[in-house]
Amino acid sequence: MLKRNKRFLLMLLALALLFGCVGCSDGVSATYEKISGAEAKALMDSESGYIIIDARTQSEYDEGHILGAILIPEYEISARAEKELPDKDQLILVYCRSGRRSKIAAEELVKLGYTNVKDFGGIIDWEYEIVK
């Protein structure tokens, strides 16, 4: 009977330690925010010091892009972000054609430590000015 109690207490202690360590994390996982084109436009009109990233290809960018956007194709984000986006707390607005690549780019930026990333989807839904 005493052995059983000791085992039970040891198991309880082990579980308490396990759950205690799990609770040690701050519980905050970095993520990006998904916003609409209208919300992105409102930020562009009201904020300063933001960056707009076009996550499409060069040829898509050349066909038309949002004024002020810099081209960093989604597949180049990890290689170019540190150099071209030195401020990891700066507001970064990301778009592509339909929203698939902007999601991938936004996720990659967050993995790289960027803290203020907003994905506003695709240019096909953009109702505002486009430059060529």
Where is each model-derived feature located?
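Hydrophobic helical h-region of N-terminal Sec-dependent signal peptides
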Residues: L13-L18
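Structural scaffold elements adjacent to functional motifs in cytosolic proteins
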Residues: I52-D54
